Amino acid sequence: MSQKMAKEGPRLSKNQKFSEHFSIHCCPPFTFLNSKREIVDRKYSICKSGCFYQKKEEDWICCACQKTSRRATSPQRPKHQPAASPVVVRAPPAKPKSPLMPAKPRSPPRPAKPRSPSRTERQPRPRPEVRPPPAKQKPPQKSKQPARSSPLRGPGTSRGGSPTRAPRFW
């Protein structure tokens, strides 16, 4: 733990421009790794977040966590963590489901189940299509309101304004 902390440098401020200090080369995780999980292009390295920018020959900066770190063996450890964590998390829930469902040989019902939710998803889709027409009716109502207010203003001002209206209100 202490070794990793020592290798990682301070976080860069959001205002700092990466291009001014070092070249930016972002790559998705495992893009530049071969089957043996060895880095093919030494200009790239991988951190916990899955990507590094190159700062210097020995220093790297991550495009996600924005931490600088050295090439050492640290990039190899994070490679296993992101790949193993989702697999381990997904595997345990899958195992309890299989013993709970005694109908393992019945494969046809399983594909039918995903189809039924898709039908339920399709039903709400037409509903939003029906909603837009009422929205179109609202703008004409708004246009009527200013039309009503404008004639009221027009005659009031044309009648002389203050001298004519003053005796009426008083």
From Swiss-Prot:
Skewed-composition ranges (Low complexity): 82-92, 138-151
Record field: transmembrane: none
Renumbered residue ranges of the record's region Disordered: 69-170
Sequence repeats: 93-101, 105-110, 111-115
Biased composition (Basic and acidic residues): 118-130
InterPro entries attached to this UniProt entry: FYVE_2, Intracell_Transport_Effector
Name of the molecule in the record: Myelin-associated oligodendrocyte basic protein
Modification sites for Phosphoserine: 85, 98, 107
Pfam families: FYVE_2
Region (3 X 9 AA approximate tandem repeats): 93-115
